[in-house]
C-alpha cells in the first residue's frame, strides 16, 4: 500500500493511471473520500500496491480503457484533418467508456474546472492533468511518439508526467480542451500517424492548389483583352481610308482635316473652327445630309452622298457640297443650315470673341458653331456640356469625345445617328425621349440638342432651329424663351428684339412671322419652299420645313387664319382665342402645344392625324405616313384656308 499526496490538478483517474491501478479499486480503497470526484491538494490517497505490476503490461489501464483506446483511435483517425479532433473524442468517452470510467470522467471534469483551469494557464508544469493532452497533442506534433509511444503509457507516466507539463505551454491550443480529457491518456499510440497525415494533406493541398491555380493563371491572359476586333489605333468608325490617327471619328476625310472643322466645302485647308458652309473641297466634321457619293465618313445616316461628306450626314439627296448639320433633303447644291450668317457673327455675352457663330456663354472662343456652356473650345460643332473638346459633333454629357454623331448618355461613342436611351448606337431615326441630339426629325422631350429640327422641351441648345427655353442665344432660328437676342428667326418670349422672324409674345417687335406663344417654332428658316410641308397650309413662306426625312412636318402655327391675331407681320396664333373654325373640317386646337407635349407637325388647326399624346419612353415613334415623305398634293381646302 502506498500513500499519494494529492497535488494540484490531480484526480483519482490520473492517480490510478499513474500507479497503474484500476480506477474502481482505487476508489474502493479510499472510502474516506466523501466525494471521489472532488479531491483537494494535500489529501492522502491510498494506492494498493498489489496492482503495481500493471504498469509493465501493455495496457496501462483495465480492459475497458483498451476498448476505449480503440474507439478513440478510430475517432481520431476520422478527425485527423482537424486539430481539434480531440473534442470529438470526448463524446466517445462518455458514450463508449464503460460505467467504471464515468465517475472518473465526472471527477476529472470537476477538478479540471475548479483547479486546473486556473493552474493550467498559470502553473501547468506541476499538474498531471495536462498529461493526456501533452501526450495526445504534444507528441503527434513533435513526432516524438515514434520513439516513445509505449513508454509513456508504461513507465514514463510516473516520473515524466510532472516533467512534461512545460510542453503544454508550447501547445496552448490544448488548454481549451483540458477540461474533458483526463480519460484520453490511453489513445496516445494511434496519434503519431495523425500528425504526418495532417502535414501530408496540407502539403498536398498546397501543392495541388498551386498546380491548379498556376495553370489557370497561366491561361489567364494579362491586360484584360476586353474588346476584340479593335485592330489598331482606336479607330472607331470603319471605312477610314488612309490617315486615321488616334481617335478619328469621321473616316474617309480626304486631305487636310485640321482641328474640328464643322462646315464642309472649305476649298483646301479646313483649319480651326470654320462655321460657314459652301467649303468646296474638304467636307469635314458634322455633315448632316447624306447622298455624298464618294467619301462617306463616320456615322453617315442616309447614303447616296455624292462626293465628300464627312461625319454625321443626316439628310439624303444633297448633291455636292453639304456643310455642317444640313437638315433639309433635296437641296440641290449648297444649302447651308445657318444661312445669311457671316462666319464672324453674333457673339454671346461673356464669350471670347472670334467665334464663328452662335456660341453659348462660358464657352472658349473660336468654336466652329453652336456649343453648349462649359465646353472646351475648338469643337467641331454642337457638343454637350462636360464633354471633351474637339469632338466632331453633338456628343452627350459624360461621353468620350471624338464621336461621330448623336450618342446616348453613358453610351460608347461613334454611333451613326439617332439612338435609343441605353441602346447600342447606329440607329437610323425616330428616337425616344432621353435620346441623344442630332436626330433627323421629331425628337422626344429630354432629348439632347443639335437636332436638325423639331425638338422637344428640355432640349440642349445649339440646334440648327427650334430650340427650347433656357437655351443660349445666337441660334440661327426658332429659339425658346429666355434666349439671347439677335436670333435669325423664331424666338421665344423673354427674347431680346431684332429677331428676323417668328418671335413669341412678350417679345420686342419686329418679328417677321407668327410663332405660337410659349411654343417652339420648329420651322426651317431660309429653306427652299419646294414642298407644301403641311398640305392644308401651303404658303409662300421661307420658314417652312422642306422635305424632312419621315412624315412631312409642316410649319408650326404659321399662316393660320384667325380674327384675333396680334398685329404682327405674319399671323401669330391668337393670344385670346375663342372657339374658331379653320374651315378644314378638323377639330380646332385652342392652345398651343405645351412643353413636354407631342411636338408634331400638326399646326394649330391641322387635322389631327397623329397621336394626341407624346410617345411613351421605351416605344419608338414612327411616322404615321412614311410614304408621304415629300408632302401631299395641294388640296382645295388649302385655298379656302389661306388668307
Curated annotation (Swiss-Prot):
Membrane-crossing residue ranges in chain numbering: none
Region (4 X 8 AA tandem repeats of Q-[IV]-K-P-Q-K-E-[MV]) location: 113-144
Region feature (7 X 13 AA tandem repeats of P-Q-V-K-K-E-N-V-G-N-I-V-S): 238-328
Induction: Expressed in the mother cell during sporulation.
Alphabetical keyword list: Repeat, Sporulation
PROSITE patterns (alphabetical): LYSM
Bias type Basic and acidic residues, positions: 115-157
A Pfam family: LysM
Listed Acidic residues bias regions: 634-643
Sequence repeat start and end residues: 113-120, 121-128, 129-136, 137-144, 238-250, 251-263, 264-276, 277-289, 290-302, 303-315, 316-328, 354-365, 366-377, 378-389, 390-401, 402-413, 414-425, 426-437, 438-449, 450-461, 462-473, 474-485, 486-497, 498-509, 510-521
GO biological process, one term: sporulation resulting in formation of a cellular spore
Residue span of region 14 X 12 AA tandem repeats of I-M-D-N-N-Q-[MP]-P-N-[IM]-M-P: 354-521
A molecular function (GO) term: lytic endotransglycosylase activity
Key word DNA-binding present: no
Entries under SMART domains matching the protein: LysM
Function: Required for the normal assembly and anchoring of both the spore coat and the exosporium layers.
UniProt record similarity statement: To B.subtilis SafA.
Name assigned to this protein: Spore coat assembly protein ExsA
Upper taxonomic lineage: Bacteria, Bacillati, Bacillota, Bacilli, Bacillales
